[in-house]
Amino acid sequence: MSAIFSFQSLARCSQTKARSGIFLTPHGIVETPRFMPVGTLANVKTVTPAQLKETGAQMVLSNTYHLHLQPGEAIVAGGGGLHKFMGWNGPMLTDSGGFQVFSLSEMRKITEEGVTFRSPRDGQIIKLTPERSIEIQNILGADVIMAFDECPPYPANRQEVEAATERTYRWLERCITAHQRQDQALFGIVQGGVYLDLRAKAANTLTELDLPGYAIGGVSVGEPPEMMAQIVQATAPLLPAHKPRYLMGVGTYREMVIAIASGIDLFDCVIPTRWARHGTAMVKGERWNLKNAKFREDFAPIDETCPCYACQNFSRAYISHLVRSQEILAYTLLSIHNITELIRFTQKIREAILSDRFLEEFGHWLNSAETDNR
């Protein structure tokens, strides 16, 4: 790992593989385990950078594919790079665009060279290769960048998944060659679908390349929750203990606890802001629909114990009114609360690991279904 990047494990759970640590980047530290809010188009929807900082967010994710389409990496560079362009001075990560491209199943063609697809914005034909993905990410300037990978769908047969996994490795080698900036850490991505032996082979092969960090991709794409848990539990321990481990696209309470127990450090997910835009609050493991009639005259805060701006200043009744009226402020307040909730959740897990009380305080999540909606 470059001298400007480092990962230090501070404590480990004595009964699981959970760990707490510090990931150092050029734009500051990330205390792990940590949830990362998603700012797809260089903004976390409905939330300003100042508000985002108050949630406790330390690292934010943006999307290479979407930023390439709009406004274009040249515009971002002209604005001083991604951090300055969006007004966020903390650590940042950009994904490679692979997941988004491969979700365009009817609009793209895969070859060894890369992926050709038709832009959903204007119909323009775009070619994205490992080299082009890295070039765009180098221009954007995030602290952590991701290798361009092929994300197989679920379900997919073994032959298809094996071919995608092997291509992902070859593309990673090309990404490493193309990568030009020492102030950016390139993470590799372990694919392999639901086939644990393919996951193990990919993890062992990737770790030989001694990258600054590693991610588990291709999960939360439609497979049953218990299958995702098996993938993470089998794969995470195979990744180097002295490097950060990132589980892509995961952000529910139970999923994060299972992953942390397996040794995962970082998470990202659009759930807190997406649910907010549907009038849903995340509260201590539950999902509350603020449209429900019972909240219309409920003048308590969403969560009396939450320090966020929404809970310190507004009632459930008021936010319910905003949701019913489709006021933008509703989405802002719920996004602030939901992001704060997930970050506080991972902070509490971190503290429990430091005191070796992880299993005592969070073990019930490992054996139970997601809590029912209130």
Curated annotation (Swiss-Prot):
Q: Where does Zn(2+) bind?
A: C306, C308, C311, H337
Q: What is its EC number?
A: 2.4.2.29
The entry's cellular-component GO terms read: cytosol
GO BP annotations, alphabetical order: queuosine biosynthetic process; tRNA wobble guanine modification; tRNA-guanine transglycosylation
Please list the residues that bind substrate: D95, S96, G97, G98, F99, D149, Q191, G218
Recorded GO terms, molecular function? metal ion binding; tRNA-guanosine(34) queuine transglycosylase activity
Glycosyltransferase is among the record's keywords: yes
Swiss-Prot/TrEMBL cofactor(s):
Zn(2+)
Function in brief: Catalyzes the base-exchange of a guanine (G) residue with the queuine precursor 7-aminomethyl-7-deazaguanine (PreQ1) at position 34 (anticodon wobble position) in tRNAs with GU(N) anticodons (tRNA-Asp, -Asn, -His and -Tyr). Catalysis occurs through a double-displacement mechanism. The nucleophile active site attacks the C1' of nucleotide 34 to detach the guanine base from the RNA, forming a covalent enzyme-RNA intermediate. The proton acceptor active site deprotonates the incoming PreQ1, allowing a nucleophilic attack on the C1' of the ribose to form the product.
Matching HAMAP family: Q_tRNA_Tgt
Q: What is this protein called?
A: Queuine tRNA-ribosyltransferase
* Annotated source species: Nostoc sp. (strain PCC 7120 / SAG 25.82 / UTEX 2576)
The encoding gene is: tgt
